[in-house]
Amino acid sequence: MKDQYVILTGSKNNAGDYLIKYRAKQLFSDLRPDRKIIDINGWEQLNTEKLAIINQSKALILMGGPALIKNMVPKVYALTNNLEDIKVPIIMMGTGWKSQRGNWEDTYSYPLNVKTSSLLKKIDNSGYQSSVRDYHTLNAIRFNGFNNFLMTGCPAYYDRDFIKTELQLKEVNKVAFSLGVAFIESPSMEKLMKEN
């Protein structure tokens, strides 16, 4: 086993995915300088050579982005036809869900195909906690029966200048809310924001 991690990333045509990969590599460099990082495209099926590299590593890490979708396997992560070919722990880092409506109620019955559920079961049983980028994703995963996950936020959110420093709370006089695109189609959200 080599002192390395393999990360599967989705940086193909989304600027946010490139940012996530870039920041994750910086975080690994800062926090695990003893580990080499090998980056493999998540959408490409793993061949014998890539599997050998992965199985010589400490872990396979599935990096961020809106990867949790019904057919995450094979659409986002092609992986291999047999998950048992991957001998090392598989861990998710800062992964998010993808929902057209983005409503909390959607997290209670978030659909996943059999291959995606099998991958999440393997991740859940890895012996390591995996991370998601928001509470909607965490709830969707938990309602699908997977509990070894925690909400850490997106790797891109982490400011390296403040890692390992004590939180300095200052008096807050103003709070800003970003409603995202859901605001456009949600009269109830608009009403709540105007009333409060």
Where are these regions (language model features)?
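Active-site anion-handling motifs in enzyme catalytic cores
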Residues: 1-196
